[in-house]
């Protein structure tokens, strides 16, 4: 565990699309630190079987967006961290934290130093003695964002986070904006699904017409 001095230009719900026809990603939290390292943090509530490959896709999209045309060396590619926070143990070993870096199968101690790290944080880990107490408290707080959970911790950082959360919740204006943003995203997804279904029906209809014309 180390301190991460972040720059000011960080954001939430940052959308990234590398190519016009490629699938975009919407990052929950995107941050850059003073050492120019990239952090993308995602909260995943539902257990899905594609989270590992989803983390791979997010990392590849970020990497592609970082290296501009004409840059002479791949060594200028920034280190990046994909952090997935889940209220379940995706891997089943009881750990609060699983850190993945590319390693050599033939030489387990040989790590490919490519600067790409993926971390999965499990709020329901069972090995508190192997990680910091602050991380355990933070993960518990993220799952149960309550006054009671915030009062349990000695971490001033977590208490500051809770104070900020309380201010956001108590602000009617921010609350309304949050709900509006949530509703907009919900309807955008629904419209996208409906457009997809409509296009699918159109294609089916075209196929039927083509087949009938071919018979005639």
Question: Where do the PLM segments sit?
Answer:
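Upstream accessory/linker segments immediately N-terminal to the RecA-like ATPase cores of bacterial MutS
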Residues: 106, 114-127, 133-145, 152-153
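Accessory alpha/beta interaction modules
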Residues: 1-117, 127-129, 191
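A short, ordered amphipathic alpha-helix with a cationic face
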Residues: 125-129, 209-212
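Short, charged alpha-helical interaction segments and adjacent helix-coil junctions
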Residues: 32, 39-44, 134-216
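Pocket-edge structural micro-motifs
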Residues: 84-87, 122-123, 169
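A near-ubiquitous, low-amplitude feature marking generic local secondary-structure context
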Residues: 12, 24, 38, 66, ...
